[in-house]
């Protein structure tokens, strides 16, 4: 074993959506030495930065973890593909760039019902605004001058236009911004793009910090365990280029690996449920039964149609001229088809079971999508993705073995709650209604999925069991909570319970799913954590009240 004796003030494990934010914010103080460790490579693949390139990213093993779930008992034992970003920027480098914060009630629920005191909407809004450069200008809900550029799309398909126009026919309103008080309706998504290019946290944050002498960024370095001494985190053991090395932290180790990797690393380090650790032959450093529990994710199903007009984004000979033009448009103006995130439009609606605002989200794609884009889907078409926003099903992340290279066992337990089934069934029915609006008359071909034969609840549920997939929003496996909640892994300052000098800062700390895409909230969490850490370092009291200057 080779020991790297360099000591840093802070070691951040994971250079993704949260880690890139933390590394940038903490290294603003030139007196602090910060080490950022990323298991993946640098974000040099050009398809990362071209928004339309996301349709191909899932085929590149080098920038994704390639995870699969355990067999899903309510889905015919299917082992679902679970893509997560493995590159600088993490999943913010491979996602669809939709900028969604969720509902006010989501954060108020965290604070008032789930033990996350100080994380109400009023508390977290300043950190959303701090991170943001909203191209339409600052106001009550949006900020400017932040590293994360948020813009309108530079290109939308006529099929997306038809979807948004279907709102009034179906009894919904058209909305210009889903990040305000009223968000029930349909519209176009704001996206994390700058000048027609993806604005990941690597691009928005790390780019401005990478030349700082006090920030070291190492890629292709796999963390194996947190080093502990007398109840304190003192460093990280890693494997780089086949060699095991150790890096040491003077102040804190901060895990930013996400809802799969962070609980796995905690357990490999001896922090987690005692029985599971002992079964895997791992010495128990801290018995925390909540590590790896409370896994939640948004399940997604596509109502898919063929298109009888040559519109949208097709794999077809007839589409070649449009792609030739698109190449020129993008190369010279950063506009046109290649600036599209494909999931251009969508919306939020309520099922009959909704209690506090919309519980269904839509993403409209003017294309035929098959197996997360890993398989070519020929021909013209379009689809509406249906997502249950507040699933009752709960899953787990557990260890397959005590070997760091072995994938964790991912079991989201999809559709085990009957209410989730009902919400998804209603969502499919609403999606069909929207796609049958008069604006689609000149486009609608045949229904590919679920298929016209699927009409009863039982038949639609059968379709869900056979075809539903993740829409990439896992959270909750290191949840924050109050001191009297034995299942809470971190406190409201994101410190791991019972271990000094160790925090978790990523989507795994969310107590429950927010009503929408999870990347923007993850960035907010990292912004908030940076303030906690700075205050602790400076010996200042940490306030959980909202930031005054943000």
For each predicted feature, which ranges?
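N-terminal redox-cofactor-binding region of secreted/periplasmic oxidoreductases
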Residues: 1-550
